[in-house]
């Protein structure tokens, strides 16, 4: 995933065990990887409107449970989500669902950190969602002429067990 394209850029599938995989790739003109890094911290520590900007019809709020860490100027923008849980309200198609997103350092999910900041992956945001429908989320940003490709992968049905491992 970090080294280049994957077989499924857009679409979904259901595995034999009932879990799902969703992939999406969106070109965002005029956007940079640095903007994405900044936004992921910024949207969780201010008015609810900040999260609604992403999707005004389906996003209601996202609130960092440790705003002091997110606001700390010593923490680089690309690390402001690492280890922070967000309390979120949004609708992913089945009605409003409160969830908690536990953001992770990409290496916590097995990604090679040496590949982040390269042409194949300018930056990355990872989280594990806890809700009625748990999921693992990865957003990879690839620089492109005139903007970025924002590539999202969701592994639906996977969450954290008591030890903090993904199951």
How should these model regions be labeled?
Residues 56-131:
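Glycine-rich portal/gate segments that line the openings of hydrophobic small-molecule binding cavities
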Residues 42, 60, 109, 156-158:
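Short loop/turn segments at secondary-structure transitions that flank enzyme active sites
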Residues 119-166:
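Beta-strand/loop substructures that line and gate deep hydrophobic ligand-binding cavities in soluble
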């Amino acid at each position: 995933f970090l080294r280049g394209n994957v077989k499924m850029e857009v679409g979904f599938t259901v595995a034999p065990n009932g879990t799902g995989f969703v992939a999406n790739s969106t070109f965002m003109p005029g956007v940079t990887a640095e903007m994405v890094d900044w936004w992921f911290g910024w949207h969780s520590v201010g008015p609810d409107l900040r999260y609604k900007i992403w999707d005004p019809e389906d996003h209601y709020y996202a609130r960092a449970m440790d705003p002091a860490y997110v606001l700390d100027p010593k923490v680089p923008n690309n690390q402001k989500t690492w280890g922070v849980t967000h309390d979120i309200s949004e609708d992913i198609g089945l009605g409003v669902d409160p969830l908690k997103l536990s953001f992770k350092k990409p290496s916590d999910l097995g990604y090679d950190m040496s590949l982040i900041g390269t042409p194949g992956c300018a930056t990355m945001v990872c989280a594990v969602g806890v809700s009625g429908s748990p999921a693992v989320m990865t957003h990879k940003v690839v620089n492109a002429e005139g903007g970025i490709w924002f590539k999202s992968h969701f592994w639906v049905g996977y969450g954290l067990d008591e030890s903090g491992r993904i199951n």
